[in-house]
């Protein structure tokens, strides 16, 4: 495993150097930005992404090439990067990815449950397939990944789990009932894990961004026959005069929450909403 001190990684002030992060939904968007931000702090990365199209919601996902270029960019920072093409709903694939990460990198210090989807539809008109896909990817997926990582964190008596929820995990949203249900569920799971895992020195925090300028936002716009800006403004309505935040804004929060600077933050909701929830 490369020594971060010998690579091109700049000096870290976060206490993260040498740690290992496992990130889902890592090929693009918030996951990719977070992987790169952590790598700049000297963190080794295990990147998981489905890396193929999904029947629902129907917009483009990350690709195997995205994973490859992420690995190249992370390694260029002087740290290791493992990549896994795996669906968070596939327990066998996730179990294998976690086992390989432990074997190759020795531990998992940080879990960023970021993989997720979004789609529109009135709740009473959704198909069962749409409902199940949303809940299984956005809520069951983090649970599947978490239950494979948590025993290792318990054994090492430390760890940080960051679950990427949404402002929709703190309020209701029209035509996003299944999405909101999945994100509220993730908020509840985060709080419950925080209670259960605190005795083992493990912190758990949920993140709640407003709309983010990612390929998912572009895909939703295409499905709706609208521009990304129209979708962002329709879905969000931020207090600050911006249609969205950037993936790097979420990545900055991930670095902070994973670091020693946040050592007493657990069981809470970290809101990055450009003031939306204040309206």
Where are these regions (language model features)?
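Short, small/polar-rich loop/turn modules that mediate ligand/substrate recognition or access, typified
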Residues: 198, 203, 265-267
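Substrate-binding pocket helix/loop in short-chain dehydrogenase/reductase
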Residues: 122-123, 130-135, 234-235
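Short C-terminal tail/terminal secondary-structure segment
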Residues: 2-12, 171, 254-255, 266-279
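Canonical Rossmann dinucleotide-binding motif of NAD(H)/NADP(H)-dependent dehydrogenases/reductases
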Residues: 14-46, 50
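Residue(s) in the substrate-gating loop at a strand-loop-helix junction
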Residues: 166
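A conserved structural motif in NAD(P)-dependent oxidoreductases
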Residues: 238-250, 261
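Active-site helix of classical SDR
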Residues: 146, 182, 190
């Amino acid at each position: 495993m490369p020594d971060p001190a010998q690579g091109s990684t700049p000096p870290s002030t976060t206490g993260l150097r040498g740690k290992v992060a496992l990130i889902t939904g890592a090929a693009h968007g918030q996951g990719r930005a977070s992987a790169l931000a952590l790598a700049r702090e000297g963190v080794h990365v295990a990147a998981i992404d489905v890396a193929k199209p999904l029947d629902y919601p129907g917009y483009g996902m990350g690709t195997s090439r995205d994973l490859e270029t992420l690995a190249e960019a992370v390694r260029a920072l002087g740290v290791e990067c493992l990549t896994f093409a795996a669906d968070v709903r596939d327990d066998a694939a996730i179990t294998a990815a976690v086992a390989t990460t432990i074997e190759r990198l020795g531990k998992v210090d940080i879990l960023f449950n970021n993989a997720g989807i979004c789609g529109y539809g009135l709740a009473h008109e959704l198909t069962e397939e749409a409902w199940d896909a949303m809940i299984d990817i956005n809520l069951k997926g983090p649970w599947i990944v978490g239950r494979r990582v948590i025993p290792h964190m318990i054994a090492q008596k430390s760890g940080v789990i960051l679950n990427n929820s949404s402002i929709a995990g703190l309020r209701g949203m029209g035509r996003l009932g299944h999405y909101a249900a999945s994100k509220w569920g993730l908020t509840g799971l985060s709080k419950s894990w925080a209670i259960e895992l605190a005795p083992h020195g493990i912190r758990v925090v949920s993140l709640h961004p407003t709309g983010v300028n990612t390929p998912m936002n572009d895909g939703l716009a295409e499905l709706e026959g609208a521009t990304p800006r129209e979708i962002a403004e329709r879905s969000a309505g931020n207090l600050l005069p911006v249609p969205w935040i950037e993936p790097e804004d979420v990545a900055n929060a991930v670095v902070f929450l994973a670091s020693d600077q946040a050592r007493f933050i657990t069981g809470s909701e970290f809101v990055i909403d450009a003031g939306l929830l204040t309206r």
